[in-house]
Regions:
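The right-handed parallel beta-helix/beta-solenoid scaffold, focusing on the short coil/turn
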Residues: 132, 143, 150, 158-160, ...
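Bacterial Sec-dependent N-terminal signal peptides
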Residues: 17-44
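N-terminal pre-domain segments of enzymes
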Residues: 70-108
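Sec-dependent bacterial lipoprotein signal peptides
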Residues: 1-19
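Acidic Gly/Asp/Thr-rich repetitive segments characteristic of extracellular carbohydrate-active
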Residues: 111-135
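Extracellular beta-strand-rich solenoid/capping regions of secreted or surface-exposed proteins
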Residues: 125, 129-130, 146-163, 169-206, ...
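Acidic/polar low-complexity surface segments
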Residues: 179-185, 213-222, 244-255, 261-262, ...
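Right-handed parallel beta-helix
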Residues: 164-167, 200-214, 234-248, 266-284, ...
Length: 414
């Protein structure tokens, strides 16, 4: 039985299924993380926020969580200016070795020769196509690189690490998807007859800002991924920011205004570490579903990150209906499929909205085998205009029995 709150009438509904649930992929690899059962407390406006024991979030102001081994991404701080910095500075959730920043001290190639003018879209496209560790030398100040074409990873080249040093913005100009990896795209070279199950290439983006990426009208693999689209291999985001990225406004499964991931085996979770999606009014990402992160059958570990002002703007949920083309679920995150996991640690989700279900997070494991773990995280003012799970405002959850697990986290509507 699924315990739901129906918005805006706030009528509690009991159901065994919901039309918001879409079909999804499945991988046969078991997850390496086990999750404990958590209690659920109904919450309606005016009641006390749900708080699991010892609710805290990170270190005290003025301290540096990066000095503790295992908690620092090892990345350069971003030049913030008047914009939000990368990540939740108060988050101190443990960062495993696989999730930490790649060492870029000896790059395979460097974009730029020391001036902003030398850092061009063409230079980024060429460097990514060649692969390897890539850094930038665009001068000592922040630089905005207008991407006039998409940088694409070639599957037969070395793993790509793209490190902006905290100074580089890749800007899609509202017309261009910025970065693309697809192990099942013959144009990027097939390296396996099981392209969805291969472990390479590995794509890492760190110390970068992705702005105004746009995949509207991109129909391959179902679309989505305004800033970054990934199918297959492995993928990691460290100390990066995503502002004003967009994908299609309608569609039952299209998603990822910022990031769309498909076909990554669940044994290789997508790591999102110390990164910001939106972060302030006017900077949020937007798509039919999952405006920050969207995937089908892919596991995630989201650590010490910030998600605000992202909005799922589709209508009609899933499947599409007459007069309602579908979508509108998962203001920040949309995870659909069968067997996969989602871990949220040391992160803040605030002021995200969904026209249908899950103002912050839409998590649906159609065969009820998936797991959702929430640790030392805060969820506030995430509006679900259609439906959500009782006791977890801003969430819609269908998962394995006893899920989600929640430790030292807070959930509130105000």
């Amino acid at each position: 039985m699924i315990n739901l709150i129906k918005i805006p009438s706030l009528i509690i509904v009991w159901a065994t299924a919901l039309t918001a649930c879409g079909g999804g992929g499945n991988d046969s690899v078991a997850p390496s993380t086990s999750f404990a059962q958590a209690s659920k407390t109904p919450l309606v406006p005016g009641t006390t926020p749900v708080t699991t024991p010892d609710a805290t979030l990170g270190t005290a102001p003025g301290t540096n969580p990066g000095t503790t081994p295992g908690t620092s991404p090892g990345a350069a701080p971003l030049a913030a200016g008047s914009e939000p910095v990368a990540g939740n500075a108060m988050g101190n959730f443990f960062i495993p070795a696989a999730a930490q920043a790649v060492n870029t001290r000896t790059p395979a190639r460097t974009i730029g020769t020391g001036t902003p003018e030398s850092c061009t879209s063409a230079a980024v496209v060429i460097a990514v196509a060649q692969g390897g560790v890539i850094t930038f030398n665009c001068g000592t100040n922040s630089v905005n690189i207008k991407m006039t074409s998409t940088a694409k990873v070639f599957n037969d080249k070395p793993d790509v690490t793209l490190d902006g040093g905290g100074l580089v913005t890749l800007d899609g100009g509202g017309t261009t998807r910025i970065l693309y990896q697809n192990t099942c795209d013959s144009a990027q070279v097939f390296t396996s007859n099981r392209c969805d199950l291969q472990a390479s290439p590995k794509l890492t983006v760190q110390n970068l800002t992705f702005r105004h990426g746009n995949s509207v009208g991109q129909t391959e693999e179902g679309g989505g991924g305004g800033a970054i689209f990934v199918r297959g291999g492995q993928f990691k985001i460290v100390s990066s920011r995503f502002f004003n990225n967009h994908c299609d406004a309608v569609g039952p499964d299209v998603g990822g205004g910022a990031v769309r991931v498909l076909g990554v085996p669940t044994v290789f979770p997508v790591y999102v570490v110390s990164s910001t999606f939106g972060g302030a009014a006017g900077l949020g990402n937007e798509c039919s579903n999952g405006s920050a992160l969207s995937s089908i059958g892919v596991s995630y570990s989201v650590i010490n990150s910030l998600f605000t002002h992202n909005e799922a703007i589709g209508t009609g949920a899933n499947p599409a209906q007459a007069g309602k083309p579908g979508g509108g679920s998962g203001g920040a995150i949309y995870n659909d499929g069968n067997f996969f996991s989602l871990q949220l640690g040391g992160s803040i989700f605030r002021d995200n909205n969904a026209n249908e279900g899950g103002g912050a997070v839409f998590y649906v494991s159609n065969d009820r085998s998936g797991t959702l773990a929430i640790d030392t995280s805060t969820f506030a003012r995430n509006l679900s205009r259609g439906f959500e799970t009782v006791g977890f405002p801003g969430f819609f959850i269908i998962a394995a029995p006893g899920q989600p697990s929640s430790t030292s986290s807070t959930f509130s509507l105000g």
